[in-house]
Amino acid sequence: MIALYPRLAYTSDDKQIYHSAYGMFYDGTVVCAGYALTYSAILNYLGIPCKYVISDEMSHAWNIVQINGKWYNVDLTYDDLYMTLGENAHSLIAHNCFLKSTAAMSGNTGIWHKGMSYPDGITCDDTTYDNAFWNDINTNIPVVNGNYYYIDCNVNNLKFNIVKRDKNGNTSLVCNDTYMTSGQRRVSSNPNNSSDKHYYNIFYSPLIGYNNRLYFANVNY
C-alpha cells in the first residue's frame, strides 16, 4: 500500500474544487479534504477499506485505513512537505503520518492531532507500524518485484545510497554513496539579525519504479 501514497500539490486556496477529489484531476491541487477524499477513492477502488476522518477542533481531514482487520491513521496532508518547504519539496514525500495509531498521532509525544472523530465506533489502537522503517524516509518508496526501494541521503554531502528492503526486513545497498543527488544549499535567516544565517542541504532526486525497473535522477543525468 505504501506504493500508492499519492503526491499532489497542497494549497491553502479555499476554492470548493480543492476540497474534492476532482481537484486532483483538475490541476493536481488539493487541500486536506481533497487529499483524504482522493486517497479514499483510490484505496476503496482497490479493495482496501479506507474512511474519511475529520477534526472540527483542527479544521482538518485525513484517513483511516484497515490492514489485516485493524485500523490506522494516514494523513497525506501532514506528509506533504510542500506545506513547509514550498517549491523546494519537489520529489520529497514524508511518511511520519502513515499507518499510525491514535497515540502516535496525538498528544505531546505525537504529531499533534486532536479532536479526532472516527466513524462507526472505529478505534486505531494498534501500534504495529508506529516505528516502521519508513518513518525517516522522505522519498518515494516504490515496490519492484516485491521489494521496497528508497533513497538514503547524506544531507551533509548530498551523496545518496539506494537501499533495497525485502518483505522480511533485510536491507542491502543497490549503490553505495556513488551518486550526487540533485539538491540545493538553503539559507535560514533571522529576520531580526541579517548576520544570523544557518545553512542546510535538501535533496530532490526522484526514485520511481516502472515495469519492474528503477529509475532515478542525479546531477549528472
Q: What kind of feature is each model-predicted range?
A:
Residues K70-G183, N201:
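His-Asp-centered catalytic microenvironments across diverse enzyme cores
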Residues S205-L214:
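Repeat-blade elements of multi-bladed beta-propeller folds
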Residues M24-Y35:
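Extracytoplasmic/periplasmic, Sec-exported soluble proteins
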Residues S188-P191, Y200:
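Blade-loop segments of beta-propeller domains
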Residues A33-K100:
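Hydrophobic/aromatic-rich core segments of domains that either
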Residues M1-M24:
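Secondary-structure boundary elements
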Residues D152, N218-V219:
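Recurrent small/Gly-Pro-centered beta-turn motifs in extracellular repeat architectures
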Residues Y148, L214-F216:
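Hydrophobic beta-strand segments that make up the repeating blades of beta-propeller
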